[in-house]
Amino acid sequence: MPRPSPCADSGGGMMTTLTARPEAITFDPQQTALIVVDMQNAYATPGGYLDLAGFDVSTTRPVIANIQTAVTAARTAGMLIIWFQNGWDEQYVEAGGPGSPNYHKSNALKTMRNQPLLQGKLLAKGSWDYQLVDELVPQPGDIVLPKPRYSGFFNTPLDSILRSRGIRHLVFTGIATNVCVESTLRDGFFLEYFGVVLEDATHQAGPEFAQKAALFNIETFFGWVSDVETFCDALSSTSFARIA
């Protein structure tokens, strides 16, 4: 059975049902946000941080194209588009010092310590690495948020932005599925948001099993998993059902 929104019949909105795993989910697109996580050169482009740190980014191009498709469909349906950029100030004060676990676990920070010539080039605000990939350009009405840690809810205004608009459903795309996407969706789950991941609009950091494990965790414990074609079909005008 489709899992409905807790307020599915309260606003007379246009509802749509998205086929997903482990079951379909029903939501109002105009009370839903599409979240694009960290589609920066750092994560999706050769020569960016992930590539320099030894992660494979050779298969990110189809993900970029799928995100373009999902963003277009979401914008047409009246969904809010939120873009995240992960990183810190040029001096990396926001990254935390040795007293922060981020200092010790961030592969970007470790890569720069191991290769001093990269200092100031990885995930620094204003750098090429920090910029969104050329193919993905926010439009007027979209929201672009910086974030200093893996979760988009930590030390950002995301929660208040969503609650002020009555948004309870979040559709996730981006990189990396097993790090920032999953971290943000998990935090959203704890804050009572319904999270859906479009699996072919995401990409893992690490081996393919990391993608599979993240999607298993999400569909089993924290949310729902679908794909871009199914999402676009659900948002087409013929899929809407008027809630009286």
Curated annotation (Swiss-Prot):
It catalyses: (Z)-3-ureidoacrylate + H2O + H(+) = (Z)-3-aminoacrylate + NH4(+) + CO2; (Z)-3-ureidoacrylate + H2O = (Z)-3-aminoacrylate + carbamate + H(+); (Z)-2-methylureidoacrylate + H2O + H(+) = (Z)-2-methylaminoacrylate + NH4(+) + CO2. The active site is at 38 (proton acceptor), 147, 180 (nucleophile). GO terms for molecular function: hydrolase activity, acting on carbon-nitrogen (but not peptide) bonds, in linear amides. Pfam families: Isochorismatase. Keywords: Hydrolase. Induction: Up-regulated by the nitrogen regulatory protein C (NtrC also called GlnG) and repressed by RutR. Its EC number is 3.5.1.110. It is an enzyme of class 3 (hydrolase). InterPro entries: Isochorismatase-like_dom, Isochorismatase-like_hydrls, Isochorismatase-like_sf, RutB. One of its GO terms (biological process) is uracil catabolic process. NCBIfam families: RutB. Hydrolyzes ureidoacrylate to form aminoacrylate and carbamate. The carbamate hydrolyzes spontaneously, thereby releasing one of the nitrogen atoms of the pyrimidine ring as ammonia and one of its carbon atoms as CO2. Belongs to the isochorismatase family. RutB subfamily. This is Ureidoacrylate amidohydrolase RutB. It comes from Escherichia coli O1:K1 / APEC. The lineage of its organism: Bacteria, Pseudomonadati, Pseudomonadota, Gammaproteobacteria, Enterobacterales. The gene is rutB.
